[in-house]
């Protein structure tokens, strides 16, 4: 295939625009040679500093190209130019204290320790694991390093220009037009080096599992070499701001990636610590490895939403860049308090430095919470108190009356505990005397270490949650209810904990873990991590690891039991592709067509009789996932064992069972709600019990959804199903209101009649399978709309701001 080259500067010796085609092809314009990049996913490009820029993922993306070193031969003056915008610094080593370097671009064969392999010669722009950067070149085979004092800026373009002057014996390095380093060199010719150009990775093969450690994470754009000293290019400005998040189009062919569950656009995530609502947005902070879908050197990631189902990723909030947190910025909380934080959200996190864990604090520099500054004088708690027998991490701050406290997860005598630290308002310091907030009773029940402790006041009770390690059934999240004593300690109503998830759905680290809990508009909301539990090789291919549960509205009943139901705002995702029936007998299996796919909501009220009933979804032929309630045993079962899937749950074998504490009596209603989002299922039973489960169906045609009854018919009070669309801000019928409850909208023969408080609305009229049979704008407050359909219809009223102001059930 012919490559049509642009007209180049006469002094230009090498030009690589970094515009990579979907098939992985890129090229060097002067020679016309093309090359193929490496990477697990289709190459991703965005508008760059000049044209298109290549987005490297930090664990699989790199290029080994070829240049002709003879074009650099006999040169005494050269100018090298490269545009870079890193998201993070390269991983390099998993658990070692130090800084190691990789090659962003160059032809020098240097290993992680900058040891030269082969003949002395060549050049390289290098980046270190702690943000140091340098330019290396050779003049008369003498190596010269230009090493700026400052770190390379993340999330912005750095235009790196290096001039090598063997006539005037000077090497200089500029960043965005500013001189950042210079070195003297010997007089003579520049040593060109080898023909292999390493882009995004040095020549060595550093891996953990299947993931490269010495790869660059971020944007690379035009690389150029000019004959002579070209200071005029220092004035060049980037054409576009760098965009380091990935758009949904990157995963357009991915049938497994969730679409309305929170998660970063790439990389590895874990605990959702610190959900909050601030300045008109929901914010969720979380553990993130931006360098790939594996766990190491953790940052605080940040996603935002208007509605808790459509998410956008912001830059990382806190990263391991200080001496006290250089190993990682681990979990903690976000806390807002007029006295402690000046009314703005502050981050409290576990800072780890390869020797110990401390507690540090960070403050926002703007009202959008985009930029954070670590508090001067960090850490605020300088290590674990005496008397503990294990680690010290995952802080949580709360107020009780006039007192401010912090609790931190730990262990004492082999059982999980939380330490208690009181804030001294006069000295503005935290106590650290070894006092305990609450302790477990025994290892089998309470585990050996408590991660992610959280305490929230709900009504007149306090809810305490923790995620213990090494219980008798492994890792799962537990809760207690009780009160806070005058000294800040916790007094549980019972020493015996209860499980947040339906017990048979959560053990050994499956299900929702380590929840974050926050309050907004009188609601207490909770969401947590739901791990993939996949092999690293699967995450390598996908480009991401783990997701979060749907937000749940929680409360406590009179006995201190946790009550969980889906966040009411999720109804706004419902599209017009829907199914709805009321008051009928369900026999055998009922197809919910036109509702099918991988983004679904299924909801029904079953009247309990003798026969089993439930839903099936992700179905194709006789292979399907089923959720079944068995009235005779009171058992709820989720069975995915028969579908073609990526196997991830050896302890369950694809079958999850939960015996309801109190089986639903014969003749009473049972409500089942299921949200399906590609590889995660959120289940709610009677708006009381809940579980989140991962499933990874391989079959692209596994989209069918049904409701079913076995061993006889089941009376149905209602059956609803919706295709969900996370891009919607207002959508299909979210509930049906009977005519007896309102006379604003009512039916008569051939007409839907209305008597409205405000004019200038649109009436949408649907049949029971969700088809819009009429849409009519109305400018008055009283009138009627003629319809051809008869029977039960659903009416939605939308005002001129596209807000749903009423939804009704009428008979025509």
Which sequence ranges carry the predicted segments?
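Localized edge beta-strand/strand-to-loop motifs within extracellular or lumenal beta-rich domains
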Residues: 156-170, 668-681
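Flexible glycan-contacting loops in extracellular carbohydrate-active proteins
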Residues: 183-219, 693-718
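Extracellular glycan-recognition modules
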Residues: 13-14, 20-26, 30-31, 49, ...
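Extended recognition patches within non-cytosolic domains
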Residues: 11-12, 172, 219-252, 727-730
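Secretory/extracellular carbohydrate-interaction modules
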Residues: 85-99, 585-645
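Short, aromatic/His-centered strand-loop micro-motif at the edge of beta-sheets
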Residues: 135-159, 645-671
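C-terminal outer-membrane/trafficking sorting elements
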Residues: 7-8, 734-812
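Beta-rich carbohydrate-recognition and catalytic domains
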Residues: 233-394, 399-445, 457-508, 530-579, ...
């Amino acid at each position: 295939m012919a490559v049509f080259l642009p007209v180049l500067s006469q002094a230009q010796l090498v030009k690589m625009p970094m515009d990579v085609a979907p098939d992985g092809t890129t090229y060097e314009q002067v020679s016309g040679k093309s090359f193929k990049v490496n990477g697990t996913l289709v190459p991703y490009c965005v508008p760059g500093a000049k044209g298109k820029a290549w987005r490297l993922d930090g664990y699989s993306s790199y290029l080994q190209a070829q240049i002709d070193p003879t074009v650099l031969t006999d040169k005494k003056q050269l100018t090298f130019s490269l545009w870079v915008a890193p998201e993070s610094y390269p991983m390099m080593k998993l658990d070692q204290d130090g800084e190691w370097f990789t090659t962003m671009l160059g032809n020098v064969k240097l290993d992680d320790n900058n040891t030269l392999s082969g003949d002395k010669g060549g050049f390289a722009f290098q980046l270190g694991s702690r943000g140091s950067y340098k330019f290396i070149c050779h003049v008369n085979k003498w190596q010269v390093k230009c090493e700026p004092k400052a770190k390379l800026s993340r999330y912005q373009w750095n235009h790196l220009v290096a001039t090598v002057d063997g006539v005037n014996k000077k090497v200089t390095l500029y960043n965005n037009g500013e001189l950042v380093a210079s070195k003297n060199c010997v007089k003579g010719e520049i040593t060109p080096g080898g023909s292999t150009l390493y882009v995004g990775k040095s020549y060595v093969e550093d891996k953990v599992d299947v993931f490269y450690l010495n790869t660059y994470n971020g944007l690379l754009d035009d690389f150029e070499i000019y004959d002579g000293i070209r200071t005029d290019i220092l004035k060049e400005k980037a054409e576009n701001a760098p965009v380091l998040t990935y758009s949904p189009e990157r995963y357009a062919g991915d049938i497994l990636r969730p679409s309305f569950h929170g998660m970063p656009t790439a990389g590895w995530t874990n605990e959702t610590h610190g959900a909050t609502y601030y300045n008109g947005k929901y914010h969720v902070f979380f553990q993130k490895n931006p360098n790939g879908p594996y766990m190491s050197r953790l940052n605080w990631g940040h996603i935002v939403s208007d509605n808790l189902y459509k998410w956008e990723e912001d830059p990382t909030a806190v990263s391991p860049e200080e001496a006290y947190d250089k190993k990682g910025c681990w979990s903690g909380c976000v806390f807002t308090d007029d006295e402690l934080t000046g009314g703005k959200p502050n981050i409290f996190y576990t800072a780890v430095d390869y020797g110990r864990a401390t507690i540090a604090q960070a403050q926002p520099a703007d009202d959008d919470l985009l930029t954070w500054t670590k508090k001067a004088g960090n850490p605020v708690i300088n290590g674990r108190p005496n008397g503990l027998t294990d680690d010290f991490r995952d802080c949580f701050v709360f107020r009780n009356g006039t007192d401010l406290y912090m609790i931190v997860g730990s262990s004492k005598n082999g059982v999980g505990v939380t330490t208690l630290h009181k804030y001294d308002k006069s000295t503005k310091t935290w106590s650290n005397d070894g006092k305990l907030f609450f302790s477990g009773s025994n290892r089998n029940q309470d585990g050996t270490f408590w991660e992610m402790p959280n305490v929230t006041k709900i009504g007149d009770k306090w809810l305490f949650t923790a995620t213990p390690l090494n219980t008798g059934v492994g890792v799962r999240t537990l809760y207690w209810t009780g009160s806070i004593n005058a000294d800040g300690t916790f007094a549980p109503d019972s020493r015996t904990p209860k499980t947040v998830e339906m017990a048979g759905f959560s053990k050994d680290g499956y299900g929702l873990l380590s929840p974050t809990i926050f309050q907004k508009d009188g609601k207490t909301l909770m969401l947590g991590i739901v791990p993939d539990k996949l092999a690293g090789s699967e995450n390598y291919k996908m480009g991401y690891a783990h997701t979060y549960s749907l937000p749940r509205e929680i409360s406590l009943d009179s006995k201190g039991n946790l009550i969980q139901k889906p966040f009411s705002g999720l109804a706004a995702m419902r599209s017009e592709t829907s199914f709805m029936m009321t008051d009928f007998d369900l026999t055998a299996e009922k197809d919910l067509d036109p509702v099918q796919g991988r983004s679904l909501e299924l909801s029904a009220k079953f009247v309990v009789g003798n026969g089993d009933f439930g839903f099936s979804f992700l179905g194709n032929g006789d292979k399907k996932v089923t959720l079944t309630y068995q009235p005779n045993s009171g058992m709820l079962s989720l069975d995915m064992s028969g579908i073609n899937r990526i196997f991830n749950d050896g302890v369950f074998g694809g079958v999850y069972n939960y015996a309801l504490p109190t089986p639903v009596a014969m003749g009473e209603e049972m409500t089942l709600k299921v949200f399906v989002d590609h590889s995660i299922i959120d289940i709610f039973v009677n708006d009381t019990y809940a579980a989140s489960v991962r499933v990874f169906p391989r079959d692209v045609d596994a989209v069918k959804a049904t409701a079913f009854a076995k061993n006889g018919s089941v009376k149905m009070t209602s059956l609803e199903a919706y295709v969900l669309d996370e891009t919607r801000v207002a959508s299909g019928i979210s509930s049906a209101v009977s005519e007896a409850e309102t006379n604003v909208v009512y039916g008569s023969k051939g007409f839907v009649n209305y008597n409205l408080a405000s004019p200038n609305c649109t009436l949408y009229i649907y049949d029971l399978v969700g088809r819009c049979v009429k849409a009519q704008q109305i400018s008055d407050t009283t009138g009627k709309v003629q319809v051809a359909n008869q029977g039960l219809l659903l009416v939605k009223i939308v005002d001129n701001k596209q807000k749903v102001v009423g939804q009704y059930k009428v008979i025509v």
